[in-house]
């Protein structure tokens, strides 16, 4: 089981060096002008500010069950830091900025904001908690260096709390800080202590250091409304201190050619087409040639501008959450799931060999084994693609809890390379997590596989 433990605990892109990479493609709503993310709205006009890299950059995000207060906490953080010039205050309504999100009172797609503490610069992703949008949440958590798990004191851990922790663990998010929210709604201190105990047990169950994990009790709403400083302001300050100290600054791979999995594509009037995402590795400079690969596309162009949170950059580094303006392309030419890379540095593959851990029922996986030619969906980077699983010769069944070498054949060639991690899902269930070990050529037999 040592290999199984490795697959469950190793950072997602150990072979690529840039830390976790986006895994599960979201169910994108039709894009509207008012729904442009905070990240790239500034590209609609010439940026007036230049991003100054004077502090370590870290990607964090809020995860947790629906309506436990993730977006309220995100807004409270920006409000408190804005008073010292470390952020621009973002109201709840600005973070949940799509009409259907405001109408339902839940976050559907991950939203990005930025802020700075005395020690660090943060890109913060507010991840959706509703069960229907778990795939969107994972697109948000995948580039994260650490998470803030939000749990309501009056509810305790709930179904999406478990699922978010499981998925975050599978994709290599190794450091979690906990904020027990809505403490103002609970009169009994023993109930809060029980919730904390339950959270520590849950963290330990999913492979985190439950006894060492910082847990801060407070109320994001009190902080936002500037009342009860002990539960409000001071709790958020304690949380930020814990994030600064407990979540380490990751080592970025700046030596390899740049690789940007495309998260979203936007058409900016008067400027052109912008792709957004988190730079997985390397350095991207204004004026660099690039190519878009995947989904049967191979398009070459030039990066004419780079911005991060309304500020222009001459160069972006691995870990930066950015928008890149590209020359001569229309929005319909590009799509989520493509990869923007240095020309010639990477190529799509349709067949891979991989070491795969099959999740048990207790881990949220399948109840039953599967056979050769079983067809789940593979998620890696920002793409997902149907694939056929071929079991090793002499192996008739793949059992939950097994760690084994499999061959996977994709419906279309996608960006895959040695060391790349992926997740397998069947319906709304994560059934396995794997690591690519080789990318062999397709045989004639492989090419004749039926997909209907």
Swiss-Prot record:
It holds the Pfam family GTP_EFTU_D3. Residues 55-251 form the tr-type G domain. Residues 1-43 form a transit peptide. GTP hydrolase that promotes the GTP-dependent binding of aminoacyl-tRNA to the A-site of ribosomes during protein biosynthesis. Also plays a role in the regulation of autophagy and innate immunity. Recruits ATG5-ATG12 and NLRX1 at mitochondria and serves as a checkpoint of the RIGI-MAVS pathway. In turn, inhibits RLR-mediated type I interferon while promoting autophagy. Residues 219-221 are annotated as: G5. GO terms for biological process: mitochondrial translational elongation; translational elongation. Mg(2+) binds at residue 71. This is Elongation factor Tu, mitochondrial. Keywords: Acetylation, Elongation factor, GTP-binding, Hydrolase, Magnesium, Metal-binding, Mitochondrion, Nucleotide-binding, Phosphoprotein, Protein biosynthesis, Transit peptide. It is found in: Mitochondrion. Residues 126-129 are annotated as: G3. The modification N6-acetyllysine is found at residues 79, 88, 256, 361, 418. Residues 181-184 are annotated as: G4. GO terms for molecular function: GTP binding; GTPase activity; magnesium ion binding; translation elongation factor activity. Its EC number is 3.6.5.3. PROSITE patterns: G_TR_1, G_TR_2. GO terms for cellular component: mitochondrial inner membrane; mitochondrial matrix; mitochondrion. SUPFAM superfamilies: EF-Tu/eEF-1alpha/eIF2-gamma C-terminal domain (SSF50465), P-loop containing nucleoside triphosphate hydrolases (SSF52540), Translation proteins (SSF50447). The modification Phosphothreonine is found at residue 278. The modification N6-succinyllysine is found at residues 88, 234, 286. Interacts with NLRX1. Interacts with ATG16L1. Residues 64-71 are annotated as: G1. The modification Phosphoserine is found at residue 312. Residues 105-109 are annotated as: G2.
């Amino acid at each position: 089981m040592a290999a199984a433990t490795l697959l469950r605990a190793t950072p997602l892109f150990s072979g690529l060096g840039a830390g976790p990479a986006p895994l599960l493609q979201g169910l994108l709503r039709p894009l509207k002008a008012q729904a442009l993310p905070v990240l790239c709205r500034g590209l609609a006009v010439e940026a007036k500010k230049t991003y100054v890299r004077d502090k370590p950059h870290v990607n964090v995000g809020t995860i947790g069950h629906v309506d436990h207060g993730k977006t309220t906490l995100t807004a409270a953080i920006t409000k408190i830091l804005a008073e010292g010039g470390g952020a621009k205050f973002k109201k709840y309504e600005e973070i949940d900025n799509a009409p259907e999100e405001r109408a339902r009172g839940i976050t559907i797609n991950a939203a990005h904001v930025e802020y700075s503490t005395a020690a660090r610069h943060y890109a913060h992703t507010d991840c959706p908690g509703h069960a229907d949008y778990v795939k969107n949440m994972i697109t948000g958590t995948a580039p994260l260096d650490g998470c803030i798990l939000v749990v309501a004191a009056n509810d305790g851990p709930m179904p999406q709390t478990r699922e978010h922790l499981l998925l975050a663990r599978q994709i290599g998010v190794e450091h979690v800080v906990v904020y027990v929210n809505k403490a103002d709604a609970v009169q009994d201190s023993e109930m809060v202590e029980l919730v904390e105990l339950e959270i520590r047990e849950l963290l330990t169950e999913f492979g985190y250091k439950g006894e060492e994990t910082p847990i801060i009790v407070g109320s994001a709403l009190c902080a936002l409304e500037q009342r009860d400083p002990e539960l409000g302001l001071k709790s958020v300050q304690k949380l930020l201190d814990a994030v600064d100290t407990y979540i380490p600054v990751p080592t970025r791979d700046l030596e390899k050619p740049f690789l940007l999995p495309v998260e979203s594509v936007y058409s900016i009037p008067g400027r052109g087409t912008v792709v957004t995402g988190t730079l997985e590795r390397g350095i991207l400079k204004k004026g660099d040639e690039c190519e878009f690969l995947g989904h049967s596309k191979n398009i070459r162009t030039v990066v004419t501008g780079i911005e991060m949170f309304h500020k222009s950059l001459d160069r972006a580094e691995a870990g930066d959450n950015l928008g890149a303006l590209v020359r001569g392309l229309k929005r319909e030419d590009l799509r989520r799931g493509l990869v923007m890379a240095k020309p010639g540095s990477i190529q799509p593959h349709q067949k891979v060999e991989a070491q795969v851990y099959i999740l048990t029922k207790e881990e949220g996986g399948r109840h039953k084994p599967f056979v050769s030619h079983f067809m789940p969906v593979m998620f890696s980077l920002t793409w997902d693609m149907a694939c056929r699983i071929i079991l090793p010769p002499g192996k008739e069944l793949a059992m939950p809890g097994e760690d084994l070498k499999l061959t996977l054949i994709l419906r279309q060639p996608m960006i895959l390379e040695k060391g790349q991690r992926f997740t397998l899902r069947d319906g709304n269930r994560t059934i396995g997590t794997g690591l690519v070990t080789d990318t062999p050529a397709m045989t004639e037999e492989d090419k004749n596989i039926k997909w209907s």
